[in-house]
Amino acid sequence: MQLNPAEISELIKSRIEGLAASSDIRNQGTVVSVTDGIVRVHGLSDVMQGEMLEFPAAADGQPSFGLALNLERDSVGAVILGEYEHISEGDTVKCTGRILEVPVGPELIGRVVNALGQPIDGKGPINAKMTDVIEKVAPGVIARQSVDQPLQTGLKSIDSMVPIGRGQRELIIGDRQTGKTAVAIDAIINQKGQGVTCIYVAIGQKASSIKNVVRALEQAGAMEYTIVVAASASESAAMQYVSAYSGCTMGEYFRDRGEDALIVYDDLSKQAVAYRQVSLLLRRPPGREAFPGDVFYLHSRLLERAARVNADYVEAFTKGEVKGKTGSLTALPVIETQAGDVSAFVPTNVISITDGQIFLETSLFNAGIRPAINAGISVSRVGGAAQTKLIKGLSGGIRTDLAQYRELAAFAQFASDLDEATRKQLDRGARVTELLKQPQYSPLSTALMGATLFTVNKGFLDDVDVKKVLAFEAGLHQYLKTSHGALLDRLQQNRAFDKEGKDEAELTQAITAFKKSFV
């Protein structure tokens, strides 16, 4: 059989065209040293800051990943996310070309996940349809809208004196064992039926404490709208550092789609300590209190992502799918102080970043005033605009009464005979202080809170014994629920008294009637 030259050339051409000679270009390097979860890698010339690096798989076949944090002249300093015992000198490290991402979306609601969004509650896999990067730029000034919608915590002392609005950052600060977590959990429980998705980020806490929080949320039915991100004390410093950003990204998913979300960081002191540990192991120069120079930026870039975004931003983000809706992410960061020292490095940083703070005091807590809020130095810089008309109108006198009471109580210790006006002021203050006490996991509705504040404002409690004030309040709430349900429904819906004064008259009548029967 003889082939002519044209056929031969056609055959060669077709063979060449069918040849798959593709090559996969990947940037890779070699492990130089491994110490305390910090890996030095030689090579990786094109690596990005914060890029995920792929390390050899562990014995169970799960791939190991790290985060490139230090980009030096001849090596890269990376921190391992998870176990690092199986990594040794000479191992190959590959660039992934991706920044660290976590799963986001409604599939995460009701689940407990780790800092990487992997389930740790034993309820099976999370089939999230989307992932998103943990480090994002916060919305700009043009994309934002002013805070004017309330985020009710259900706590009398907070909603009346330091109100929180949707999209605000309100710091909860105090010594250990002063009820900081309790305030945050009550705020989450009170969002039931309010259309707010909650994210609770536990950083550096004991696993048993996190378990107790999850149990409390389950019992209150709050896990139906809550995601728990847990980086316990037993996990690496890198996981504790990353967890806050992971939780924030999960919250931003809802914010950017015109929904409301609430995120609690419990607590950022431990996150700062974890970041300090990572930074010192990476040989970064230490500054004040041995924290690295960018510890302010650590918290500012996180908390600036909590915002209320306008309808244009939401419409542009969703490509026109969601119109005319604003979204919000409200942040409640927690900071633990040492012996009440709010002028330490991390507390002052976070105070300057947030829109106000709720200061909890050990002395008040030990005196049985719980929540132990110090009304004098607790402020809300933007929440006043978001307060409901009902609570705003009734709470004006509360802070003044308390402030005057604290001042007079200090002098009254030394005075033997007090004039009538001073005694009245002291009596009113004692009753207000007693009335602001509230048991844990029992947030109040706006209507019942309004009724309570109305009672003290109009002087109905002036002749009730201080020890019976809380019993009076509980009895009044029960009486209003059974006999004046329609009034409570109106107040809850309108969040204000009617202009004709009928609601006010009915409430006065109801309290007077109840008081006659109260023994």
Curated annotation (Swiss-Prot):
UniProt record similarity statement: Belongs to the ATPase alpha/beta chains family.
Cellular compartments per GO CC: plasma membrane; proton-transporting ATP synthase complex
Keywords: ATP synthesis, ATP-binding, Cell inner membrane, Cell membrane, CF(1), Hydrogen ion transport, Ion transport, Membrane, Nucleotide-binding, Translocase, Transport
Catalytic reaction equation(s): ATP + H2O + 4 H(+)(in) = ADP + phosphate + 5 H(+)(out)
EC number, as in UniProt: 7.1.2.2
Keyword Ion transport: yes
PROSITE patterns registered for this protein in UniProt: ATPASE_ALPHA_BETA (PS00152)
Enzyme class: translocase
SUPFAM superfamilies referenced in this protein's UniProt entry, alphabetically: C-terminal domain of alpha and beta subunits of F1 ATP synthase, N-terminal domain of alpha and beta subunits of F1 ATP synthase, P-loop containing nucleoside triphosphate hydrolases
Intracellular or extracellular location(s): Cell inner membrane
Subunit structure: F-type ATPases have 2 components, CF(1) - the catalytic core - and CF(0) - the membrane proton channel. CF(1) has five subunits: alpha(3), beta(3), gamma(1), delta(1), epsilon(1). CF(0) has three main subunits: a(1), b(2) and c(9-12). The alpha and beta chains form an alternating ring which encloses part of the gamma chain. CF(1) is attached to CF(0) by a central stalk formed by the gamma and epsilon chains, while a peripheral stalk is formed by the delta and b chains.
Protein known as: ATP synthase subunit alpha
